[in-house]
Amino acid sequence: QYYLHQCLSPEEIIGRLAAEGAPIQISHETIYQRIYEDKRKGGKLYKLLRSQKTYRKRYGSGQQRRGMIKNRTSIDDRPAIVDQKIRIGDIEGDTVIGKNQQGVIITLVDRVSRFTFATKAKSKHAKGVAQGIINLLKPHQHRCHTITVDNGKEFAFHELVAKQLQVDVYFAHPYHSWERGLNENTNGLLRQYFPKKTNFKKVTEQELQAAIFMLNHRPRKCLGYKTPFEVFYKFGFSSASSD
């Protein structure tokens, strides 16, 4: 139950226990069976399972969000090493918008470690988003190489970000969300803590950071059941996935 309360899936629970060297005599399917048996008896363990479908709400239509951003550099010009996922510091960036366009959360995810940075933006406008990105990554500037974002107008101040952080900013192709698939997936994980209809203006920065702490300390199958925190700060173990 401890791991379920940490929002781990049954598969992640078994994987993490194995990575820690614990003797395991059950499978993740057994955990599911026991959870649903508990439900039939009136128990509430099933409520600890993660939702299978998550959604992101963005402000405005695709046409409203996208436009001609000056001096943008296409993902086509991004160094090949970014796709190889062999170094820390290549970041995917995005924003998540709350109910009725109330409140904006900036999310940044390291492509190798899956380590996530997030903060509430002061506004959904480009300058506020740019400053939020700078504030998040400034303490880690020495480790950052690239940032890849979509073509939303909230990233129009990309040159300010590049100058302040000394990184290269690249833009994915319009409507090619798979080019930032990790960030899209991470935003879905964040929705486990802040569901679709959440008004982000009512979410405190402390509540957001508590959720990000949980994500960064959740063991991931793609990391050999290490956590993003462990990989980001102790990068070098051989079992990191390149998918």
What is the predicted function of each stretch?
Residues 164-165:
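Short, structured coil segments at secondary-structure junctions
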Residues 149-151, 156-161, 171-192, 201-213:
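RNase H-like two-metal-ion nuclease catalytic core shared by retroviral integrases
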Residues 97-101, 118-141:
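Active-site beta-loop-alpha junctions of metal-dependent nucleic acid enzymes
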Residues 76-116:
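An active-site-proximal beta-strand-loop segment
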Residues 23-83:
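Basic, flexible linker segments flanking DNA-binding modules
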Residues 13, 31, 94, 108, ...:
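Mobile genetic element proteins and their domesticated derivatives, centered on retroelements
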Residues 196-243:
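C-terminal domain-tail junction helix/linker
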Residues 1-24, 78:
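A short, amphipathic alpha-helix used for macromolecular contacts
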